[in-house]
Amino acid sequence: MSKAKLDDSTQRPLYGERIIEESKIICFDNPNKKRIYEISIQLPEFTCKCPFSGYPDFAKLSIIYQPNLKVYELKSLKLYINSFRDIKISHEEVVNRIMDDLVNEGSPHWIHLNAAFNPRGNVSMQLDIFSGQKKN
């Protein structure tokens, strides 16, 4: 069992906003490196802020990937995704940043990130980004 990160000032475990602020994507070894398989992760409560109005934007993120040597640890991924909650950033920029971080940390054979943003002002938006070569 791993030890929880401690707040330097209080020596209490980091919780809530403080642990989200320090979040990063963590990976662990792929338990079956010889097998080609896909993992699908759904993150239905993504939020960030519009860089122009400051209003919140909501999206459902879907990640499908074929792991190479590493797989993503889900709690760290959740906290990393939650870290965008108060950041003013465009849809295009945030989805590309998330994809860059996923590729840099996990180096999957292939990955697809879909972001389906909720309608605002009668306009909805969906972004799809791919990286790598899908293996059969």
Swiss-Prot record:
Pathway: tRNA modification; tRNA-queuosine biosynthesis. Substrate binds at Y72, E73, L74, H91, E92. GO terms for cellular component: cytoplasm. InterPro entries: GTP-CH-I_C/QueF, NADPH_dep_7-cyano-7-deazaG_red, QueF, QueF_type1. Signal peptide: none annotated. Keywords: Cytoplasm, NADP, Oxidoreductase, Queuosine biosynthesis. The active site is at C50, D57. The keyword NADP applies. GO terms for biological process: queuosine biosynthetic process; tRNA modification. It holds the Pfam family QueF. It is found in: Cytoplasm. It comes from the Bacteria. Belongs to the GTP cyclohydrolase I family. QueF type 1 subfamily. This is NADPH-dependent 7-cyano-7-deazaguanine reductase. The gene is queF.
